[in-house]
């Protein structure tokens, strides 16, 4: 037991040293309004709503230069409701994102953890409900997933370097069902082109 405690302290000390050399950003947003609704079951209603024009969230993102063109990165992000102070998800604290990654300018990016699927992550840039977890702005049928933002647990994401405005990516989510390797697994691929000249 004594050896385990010493090893744990050594690991904590190493983590502290690494953190001191890292770039870590704390970010977030809060959106609260009081809409007046003229007809709710024949009556008027004034209430308090969260995340009307942008999501309520807080998060941490960071990176560390490892040298040789490599960079370690991570993101932790929690969505919540300002009006009642509760998280969006009762089962996952970092319900919007929780991943670690390794970035290379020449080889691309590899990320592991809970990540948004490419459908919502890619199309959200152009949708009228582009702010994820915005319950008031979404497309009919929610076919692009923007109103719900489906993060994929236990997922591996690979993104290619940008090549002349083009970038491709692939995502695989492990189902983690014992004895059924294909159950609950997910696939997602994307290709995107962006250019300042268009």
Report the location of each language-model feature.
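Short, Φ-rich (hydrophobic/aromatic) sequence segments
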Residues: 8-10, 27
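Repetitive helical segments and hydrophobic/amphipathic motifs
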Residues: 11-13, 168
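Outer membrane beta-barrel
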Residues: 21-36, 46-174, 183, 192-196
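An N-terminal domain-cap segment
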Residues: 41-43
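Short helix-to-loop capping/linker segments positioned immediately adjacent to catalytic or ligand/cofactor-binding
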Residues: 177-179, 189
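Conserved adenosyl
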Residues: 186
């Amino acid at each position: 037991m004594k050896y385990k405690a010493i090893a744990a302290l050594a690991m904590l000390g190493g983590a502290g040293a690494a953190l001191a050399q890292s770039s870590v950003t704390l970010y977030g947003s809060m959106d609260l309004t009081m809409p007046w609704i003229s007809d709710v079951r024949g009556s008027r209603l004034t209430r308090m709503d969260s995340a009307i024009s942008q999501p309520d969230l807080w998060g941490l993102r960071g990176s560390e230069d490892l040298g040789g063109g490599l960079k370690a990165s991570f993101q932790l992000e929690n969505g919540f409701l300002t009006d009642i102070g509760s998280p969006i998800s009762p089962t996952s604290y970092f319900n919007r994102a929780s991943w670690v990654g390794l970035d290379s300018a020449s080889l691309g990016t590899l990320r592991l953890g809970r990540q948004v699927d490419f459908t919502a992550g890619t199309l959200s840039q152009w949708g009228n409900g582009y702010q994820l977890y915005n319950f008031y702005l979404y497309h009919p049928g929610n076919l692009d997933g923007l109103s719900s933002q489906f993060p994929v647990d236990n997922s591996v994401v690979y993104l290619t370097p940008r090549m002349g405005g083009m970038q491709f990516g692939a995502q695989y989510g492990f189902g983690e069902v014992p004895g059924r390797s294909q159950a609950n697994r997910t696939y997602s691929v994307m290709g995107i082109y962006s250019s300042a000249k268009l």
